[in-house]
Design a protein with these regions (language model features):
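Active-site-facing substrate-recognition patch
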Residues: 1-68
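PRPP-dependent phosphoribosyltransferase catalytic core
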Residues: 2-19, 141-216
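Phosphate/pyrophosphate-binding loops at sites that engage ATP/ADP/AMP, CoA/4′-phosphopantetheine
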Residues: 61-73, 143-146
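Short glycine-rich phosphate-binding loop at a beta-alpha junction
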Residues: 70-79, 154
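Conserved acidic residues
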Residues: 73, 121, 151
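Generic structural signal for helix capping and beta-alpha/helix-loop junctions
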Residues: 84, 107-108, 160, 185
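Short, glycine/charge-rich flexible loops or terminal/linker lids adjacent to PRPP-binding catalytic cores
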Residues: 85-124, 132-138
Length: 216
């Protein structure tokens, strides 16, 4: 996994915290839709309300494309949260645009991908959040099945679990992110939002997320 340079990653982390797209509550944890208890919750859709935030994400994505020498023919967003940022990036790069559903429609032409992906087209997949990587890699496989060549996945935020890194490596798919959970946690401490004890609780969760709830 490739992350933005430290100053850029810190700025994105501060952006997420400022807009409450990422909320951190180690002493009053959240329950995710999966049922897992966690000290953090991420909803990057809150960034859509701010033109400044959207433009900051777009600039970050463009920097990654330049650094990786990516020249996509198509930018494909994951439905639904990846679509706005994919649209912004495609407009900036002057590329085609598509989006990938979580499942094919049950009616009409039963498409999984909306928008054209020509055979052998270079495709960049845009996701807002990477946790386990399952949904992003599912979209990658859908693009590959459609005949596209996936350059990689771009995401705003990743939890940066070891298992996620392994999953992307196994899929032979580069993952580039603007910032990560450890960076957000550090910025939350340096900005006075969290104390050192709370930061340790976050580190404990990141090390063993499945077991964390029983220890707090």
């Amino acid at each position: 996994m490739t992350t933005a340079d430290a100053p850029d990653a810190d700025r994105i982390a501060e952006l997420l915290l400022h807009h409450q797209a990422v909320q951190v509550r180690p002493r009053d944890p959240f329950t995710w839709s999966s049922g897992r208890v966690a000290p953090i919750y991420c909803d990057n859709r809150l960034l859509l309300s701010s033109a400044t935030a959207r433009n900051t994400v777009q600039r970050g994505f463009v920097k990654h494309c330049i650094a990786a020498s990516w020249q996509p023919d198509v930018v494909a967003g994951t439905a639904t949260a990846g679509i706005p940022h994919a649209t912004s990036l495609a407009d900036r790069l002057g590329t085609g645009l598509a989006y990938v559903r979580s499942a094919a429609k049950a009616h009409g032409r039963q498409r999984r991908i909306e928008g054209r992906i020509p055979d052998d087209a270079s495709v960049l997949v845009v996701e807002d959040l990477v946790a386990t990587g399952g949904s992003a890699l599912d979209a990658v496989q859908a693009v590959r099945n459609a005949g596209g060549h996936v350059l990689g996945v771009l995401a705003i935020f990743a939890y940066d679990f070891d298992a996620t890194r392994t999953a992307f490596a196994d899929a032979q798919c580069p993952l580039h992110v603007l910032t990560t959970f450890p960076t957000v946690a550090d910025v939350a401490v340096s900005s006075g939002r969290l104390d050192a004890d709370a930061r340790q609780l976050l580190a404990d969760w990141h090390q063993a997320p499945a077991d964390w709830a029983s220890s707090v």
